[in-house]
Structures are given as structure tokens and as C-alpha cells.
Curated annotation (Swiss-Prot):
Protein name: Deoxyguanosinetriphosphate triphosphohydrolase-like protein
Presence of the UniProt keyword Protease in the record: no
SMART domains in the record: HDc
Annotated stretches, region: Disordered: 20-39
GO molecular function, a single term: triphosphoric monoester hydrolase activity
Family from the record: Belongs to the dGTPase family. Type 2 subfamily.
Keywords, in A-Z order: Hydrolase
Pfam families attached to this UniProt entry: HD, HD_assoc
Originating organism: Brucella abortus (strain 2308)
Record HAMAP family: dGTPase_type2
Every HD domain range: 73-217
């Protein structure tokens, strides 16, 4: 299948695509909708959830209140969903499932991005640790309180499987990170509802995973240029970026730097998306899966970058880590955010009455591990701004994040 014509008109679902007509169902059985597939209902529940709205005020790379035009978890999530749908459409997969997994993949992130997660994990080490992917699962299976008949969102098996395993199997010979223990919340849920942790997730989930990489690689460049932490000249160090910039400069020799940066970003997204489509088609032609089960039983992911693009992406990531994620101004804010999260955990763990009613009720009956998890759930749900306000209320000495 060539890239020409993709997205035009009706194209038959691939035999190895996830099929909502054969969904494995939900943990709590529900009547089917007469107007929406199970995966469409999952997507809609995710969009209408409280956790989805909170993403608006959670940091992607920069502290959220630094500027209105930088990415937040919400804008990043929407961008990932768009790319995931495009990939699924090109590969004749279920677009709604790919979108649902993309929309839910960052639910468990703490305030202040990975800095907040690291800080919370440090405090939770004695109590099973903290992992944002496991927290996403807790949110959609336990912590969202919207429906009369169940806690969580009661998502379909396929969406939950994609959420937990979109980056690869967690157990077995094909585990993505065999040296890292599977987070306890995932093991606990899996004991109730087997997500087949040793097998690969659906192709739709794999689309969401690679879409995440494509989105943040490109858009962190955009935000870095906007913040003045990166320059177009510095990006000439990255072979992929230099090739694309040379194309832009040749075609538009008098283009201003802002538009030049945007032209770079859009071309980078395009070239990565096209690479994934071509590579996935090559792997599918080689593996020849005939059913969804064949996809689950593969020894490797079938959706991903080509070897050449993966090598170029690694160079780009190294550049971003050196020049953006560990830029001095970002590191200073990271230290301040780390202090806020750890201070809040210590305070609420020592005195649970500092938490709102719905979180502190019943804390006196909890053992230390259960109390620590309750506090972690509370803190993980905070937005950046709420965490700053709570720290100021409790300590009146909040570090300056501006």
C-alpha cells in the first residue's frame, strides 16, 4: 500500500485490527450502546472525565504558568491522539481505540511533569513506589467517581490493555524493561482482570505509543525555540533537523525564525509519521498476522520507527536532554518543584487532616502503606497551580517557579 490515497474514502478494516464487535467487554458488564462502539464510548468517557480536564494545568516540560503558549499535558495529549488516529487510519486499524489509548496515556502524571513523579516515587519507595502508568490505571479503574454502578470509568479490556502495555509487554521474554519490577497496582488489578502482561498490546496501542514519541520530539523543539532555550543554529547539530532546516531555508530564504521553526516542526512530524507507516507496512508484510491474536503473539512490536529513523531520533533525544530538559533554567525550576511535592507528601502523611474531606475521611483506619498510597493519589491528582497554592497555604514559603 503506497502512501498516496491514505485517508480518502472507505477502506476495509484490516483483519489484524482490533474489532469492537469482538471486544472482550468490561469488568462490570453494561448494555451496549445502540449508537457507539465500545471503543467510542471509552474515548468519550475519557474526554468527559475529571482527570482529562486536570491535564490542562499539568506541565509537559515547562512549568505550566510560565506562558500560555507552551504545551501542557492536555495539549500534548490532543496532539498525540491526532497522530495516533492518522497512523491507525493509514494502517486500516480502529481509529477510535488508538485515540482512546492516546487520550488516556498521561492520566497518571503528577504536577510538574517527570520531576513531580520522581519526587513522589522517592517518598513512596518504602510503600511500593509510584509510577505514572500504574497511576493512570488506578484513575480509570478506581479513583474517578462519576458513575452509580462502578468506580472508575469501566473501560473496555482493549483500552485498559493498551493503557498498561502501550510501550510493550511488562513480563516474560519480550518485556520492554525486564529489570524493572511491575508496579504493584498493575499486578493487583491484573489478578482481577487479566491483561496478559507478557504479550504485546494491540496495533492501535502501538500507534498511540509511537505517536507519543513523535509528538514530544517535535513539540519540545517548538517550545524550546519559543522559550529561547534552543536556537535554529543549535539544531544544526542534529542531522535530521539540519536536513529539514536546509530544505526550509532553500525554499524560503527570507523566512523569519519563528516561521522557520514551525516549518521544521511540521516537516519533522510528517517525516516521522511516514517512516512509521512504511516501516509498519514492511513488518506486517513480513509477519503476516491474520488476526488480532497473531498481533498479540508477535515477538516484537509491529508499529515503530525504521532502524535508520530510530537512530536519528536517539541523536535528537540526546540533544534535547542536553540543551532543553537539563538547561540551567529548567533545572532550577525542577529543584523547586521537587521540594514542593516532597514537602506536601510529608505534611499530609504526618497529618492527613490537611487533605480535603474526601481524602482524609477514614485515614485513621489505614496502615502506613495504605495511608501513603492515599496521599500519593491525592498529590498525583493535583495540578501545578493547585500544588503551588497548597504549599503556600501550608508553608508560606513556596519556592519561586516564575
Amino acid at each position: 500500500m503506497s502512501l498516496e490515497g491514505i485517508g480518502f474514502g472507505y477502506r476495509e478494516r484490516a483483519p489484524y485490527a482490533s474489532n469492537p464487535a469482538f471486544s472482550r467487554g468490561r469488568l462490570v458488564p453494561e448494555p451496549e450502546s445502540p449508537t457507539r462502539t465500545p471503543f467510542q464510548r471509552d474515548r468519550d468517557r475519557i474526554i468527559h472525565s475529571t482527570a482529562f480536564r486536570r491535564l490542562k494545568h499539568k506541565t509537559q516540560v515547562f512549568i505550566a504558568h510560565e506562558g500560555d503558549h507552551y504545551r501542557t499535558r492536555l495539549t500534548h495529549t490532543i496532539e498525540v491522539a491526532q497522530i495516533a488516529r492518522a497512523l491507525a487510519r493509514a494502517l486500516r486499524l480502529d481509529e477510535d481505540l488508538a485515540e482512546a489509548v492516546a487520550l488516556v496515556h498521561d492520566f497518571g502524571h503528577t504536577p510538574f511533569g517527570h520531576t513531580g513523579e520522581d519526587a513522589l516515587n522517592e517518598r513512596m519507595k518504602k510503600f511500593g513506589g509510584f509510577d505514572h502508568n500504574a497511576q493512570s490505571l488506578r484513575i480509570v479503574t478506581k479513583l474517578e467517581h462519576r458513575y452509580a454502578d462502578f468506580d472508575g470509568l469501566n473501560l473496555s479490556w482493549e483500552t485498559l490493555e493498551g493503557l498498561v502495555k502501550h510501550n510493550g509487554p511488562l513480563l516474560g521474554p519480550y518485556a520492554a524493561h525486564p529489570d524493572i519490577p511491575v508496579p504493584q497496582p498493575i499486578l493487583d488489578f491484573n489478578a482481577r482482570y487479566d491483561l496478559e502482561l507478557s504479550r504485546f498490546a494491540s496495533l492501535e496501542a502501538q500507534c498511540a505509543a509511537i505517536a507519543d514519541d513523535i509528538a514530544y520530539n517535535a513539540h519540545d523543539i517548538d517550545d524550546g525555540l519559543r522559550a529561547g532555550l534552543l536556537t535554529l543554529e543549535s539544531l544544526d547539530e542534529v542531522p535530521l533537523a539540519k536536513r529539514l532546516l536546509d530544505i526550509v531555508r532553500t525554499r524560503y530564504p527570507n523566512l523569519d525564525p519563528v516561521r522557520t521553526g514551525h516549518e521544521l516542526v511540521r516537516r519533522q512530524i510528517t517525516i516521522m509519521v511516514e517512516d512509521v507507516i512504511e516501516e509498519a507496512q514492511r513488518r506486517l508484510a513480513s509477519a503476516r498476522p491474520g488476526t488480532m491474536e497473531d498481533v498479540h503473539n508477535q515477538p516484537r512490536a509491529l508499529v515503530g520507527f525504521s532502524d535508520a529513523m530510530r537512530a536519528e531520533e536517539k541523536v535528537l533525544k540526546r540533544f534535547l536532554f542536553k540543551n532543553l530538559y537539563f538547561h540551567e533554567s529548567v533545572v532550577v525550576r525542577r529543584h523547586a518543584a521537587d521540594r514542593i511535592v516532597q514537602d506536601l507528601f510529608d505534611a499530609c502523611f504526618t497529618d492527613p487532616s490537611l487533605m480535603p474531606d474526601e481524602w482524609r475521611l477514614g485515614c485513621e483506619a489505614l496502615d502506613k502503606a495504605a495511608l501513603a498510597r492515599r496521599v500519593a493519589d491525592y498529590l498525583a491528582g493535583m495540578t501545578d497551580n493547585y500544588a503551588v497554592r497548597e504549599h503556600r497555604r501550608l508553608f508560606d514559603r513556596t519556592p519561586d517557579l516564575a
